[in-house]
Amino acid sequence: MISPLAYVNPDAKIGKDVTIHPFAYIDKNVEIGDNCTIMPYASILSGTRMGTNNTVYQGAIIGATPQDFKFKGEDTLLKIGNNNTIREKVIINRGTNTTDCTIVGNGNFLLESVHLAHDTHLGNNCVLGNAAKTAGNCIVADNVILGSGVIVKHGCRIVTWSLVKDGCRANKDVPPYIVAAHNPIAYYGINAYILRKEQKLTEEIIDDIAKASVKCINVGQALKTPY
């Protein structure tokens, strides 16, 4: 259902069973897949490619022009996968000519006022707390949790199954399975719950990983783990 009070550009491609509420704005050069819901006052802007079963809440701006001085109006993209929840006032910028694309994977939960800047690559099944923000060209891999108010510096990588605690300024890369906290960011522990639940590791192995994280592994070595 598309409300007659919504604006949908005639050139936009809208899938089946899409609900677009009153006062939503759908720009030209937009593709929205099947079974998506666009709430009132949400804006889906030019260059956005959205998969299926996504919900975009009130006041979100999806596919906004990059906040980057080198951007000169190129035709760049924002690609969003399937089954994402994008809450109120989230802003996601499309790419610049460095990568041409900002990417959001599948099954992510972006809480109120999250900002993903240009050329950010967000993986699958991530949770980004209220007002968490990434600068340009960041990589946030699969199954990452960014607490509320986290700020990720330009170009940093937050690697799979890591957790960055509330209010942290992530000015360096975070290795996999690590809990990071403090300002400036520092090692806080390992994500033992995930190692136990998802990787089925024994307590002995988890203890060895914890010791290695403290004594034996620098960030550069740890980041060689595929994300």
Each predicted region: which residue ranges?
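Structural signal for interior beta-strand "rungs" in well-ordered beta-sheet cores
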Residues: I2-A186
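Intrinsically disordered, low-complexity terminal regions
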Residues: L195-Y227
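SDR active-site lid
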Residues: I178, P184-K197, E203
